[in-house]
From Swiss-Prot:
Record GO terms (molecular function): GTP binding; metal ion binding
Binding, Mg(2+): 71, 93
Protein name, UniProt field: Probable GTP-binding protein EngB
Gene Ontology CC annotations of this record: cytosol
Biological function: Necessary for normal cell division and for the maintenance of normal septation.
Any Pfam family matching the protein: MMR_HSR1
Length: 241
């Protein structure tokens, strides 16, 4: 085979590999779209560990500072305004709130493939200190001890980056060996020119962490940015279980 033929063969192989990657990405995007096209419902709020539902479907949780946009992201993800209650008052979510696709009885193996868990925010709340401390214990106990929890999406406000209490939660997840991935919220609130730098800075702060799943997903609940990427990431996760 001549050198020219070798080059052409290498180019064709690279093109075939790129096509295969694109096809796989498109398939995941479609799986994510179909999963979240279903009607989703709220099933329970959990004020303490003893009220957790029986372990069954894969659970993914959304963690983050108060007012980072967890509830808004869940609503945008499932395409259902008002499913997760939102508020401009930090600390509005006071329980572990469970959401699942509708149409499953929950009995005799008729379980949904996935449960979304909206967690109380950390860092600030307009509530008595004792109540805030109780929420904090609930969050940490859940993160450490729930065997069906397969991924935590740690939401970071794009305008502020990773703060001290975010890093403390990442430390906890690393120590507990709970897989997590960073999701930037409100990406539309910063200038587009600043996004690459933000992604680079966030990557530098997280890529060496033991339990951090690679890849940072930048989202906007208001504009819909990054939602397809997040749905595809969840679809990929479900393939493992």
């Amino acid at each position: 085979m001549s050198e020219q033929d070798k080059k052409q063969a290498a180019i064709k192989a690279a093109q075939a590999a790129a096509d295969a990657v694109r096809e796989a990405q498109a398939a995941l995007a479609e799986e994510g779209r179909l999963l979240f096209k279903k009607s989703w419902i709220f099933i329970r709020g959990v004020p303490s560990m003893k009220f957790l539902p029986p372990e069954g479907p894969v659970e993914i949780a959304f963690a983050g500072r108060s007012n980072v946009g967890k509830s808004s992201l869940i609503n945008a993800l499932v395409g259902k305004k008002g499913l997760a209650r939102t508020s401009n008052t930090p600390g509005r979510t006071q329980e572990l709130n469970y959401f699942v696709p509708d149409g499953y009885s929950g009995e005799n193996g008729d379980l949904p493939p996935l449960a979304l868990v909206d967690m109380p925010g950390y860092g600030f709340a307009e509530a008595p200190k004792a109540q805030v401390d109780a929420w904090t214990r609930l969050v940490f106990d859940y993160l450490r001890g729930r065997t069906t929890l397969k991924r935590v999406y740690v939401l970071i406000d794009a305008r502020h980056g990773i703060k001290k209490n975010d890093a403390e939660v990442l430390d906890l997840l690393d120590k507990a060996a709970v897989s997590y991935q960073i999701v930037l919220t409100k990406i539309d609130k910063i200038k587009p020119a600043g996004v690459p730098r933000l992604l680079e800075e966030t990557h530098k702060l997280t890529y060496k962490r033991a339990a951090c799943f690679p890849g940072i997903i930048a989202t906007s609940s208001e504009k819909g940015q990054g939602l397809d990427d997040l749905r595809a990431a969840i679809a990929l996760l479900l393939k493992e279980y």
